[in-house]
Structures are given as C-alpha cells and as structure tokens.
C-alpha cells in the first residue's frame, strides 16, 4: 500500500469523482475534515483523561497504603450487647 504511484493516485481520484460528482465533492471533503477534527479532539481528550486517571490512581494508592498501615496500629473498639434476660436477672 505504501507504493502508490502517480497512476494509482489518478485512478483513486477518478473513482472518487465518479462516486461523489463535481457538485458534492466539496461538501464531502468538508464533512471529512470536520470528522477528522472531532476525532482528533476526542483522542486528545481521552489521553488527557488517561493521564489524570493515572495521577489520581497513584495518589489513591499512596493514601490506601497509609490508611492500611495506620488502621492496624490503632486498637478497634469493642461493643458488648446485653440481652433482656441479663438485665432482668443480674448474676
């Protein structure tokens, strides 16, 4: 596909002209240009979102590590619940 010469390019141009015609060709080229611009902006937006997600995940990973270390160091409170029978008949 990389070896397109002048005759091949002329043939492609003729086929495009036959398919779209002289009148519709500028509109078709304009719509292709708009589509390419939208596609490029979406790709760059996805790259930016991916970079932000990496920064956020790296920060949350550090926070998770700190949280997990600190949660094992502190004693957990214990709660005891008395039943109704124990309240009526103390031992």
Curated annotation (Swiss-Prot):
Part of the twin-arginine translocation (Tat) system that transports large folded proteins containing a characteristic twin-arginine motif in their signal peptide across membranes. TatA could form the protein-conducting channel of the Tat system. It comes from Corynebacterium kroppenstedtii (strain DSM 44385 / JCM 11950 / CIP 105744 / CCUG 35717). Residues 57-81 have a biased composition (Polar residues). It is found in: Cell membrane. Keywords: Cell membrane, Membrane, Protein transport, Translocation, Transmembrane, Transmembrane helix, Transport. NCBIfam families: PRK00575.1, tatAE. Pfam families: TatA_B_E. Residues 43-91 are annotated as: Disordered. This is Sec-independent protein translocase protein TatA. It is a single-pass membrane protein. GO terms for molecular function: protein transmembrane transporter activity. GO terms for cellular component: TAT protein transport complex. Belongs to the TatA/E family. Residues 43-55, 82-91 have a biased composition (Basic and acidic residues).
């Amino acid at each position: 596909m990389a070896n397109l010469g002048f005759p091949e390019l002329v043939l492609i141009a003729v086929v495009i002209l036959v398919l779209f015609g002289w009148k519709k060709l500028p509109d078709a080229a304009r719509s292709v240009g708009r589509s390419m611009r939208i596609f490029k902006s979406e790709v760059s937006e996805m790259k930016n979102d991916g970079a932000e997600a990496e920064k956020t995940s790296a920060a949350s990973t550090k926070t998770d590590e700190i949280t997990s270390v600190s949660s094992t160091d502190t004693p957990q409170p214990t709660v005891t619940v008395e039943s109704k029978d124990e309240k009526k008949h103390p031992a």
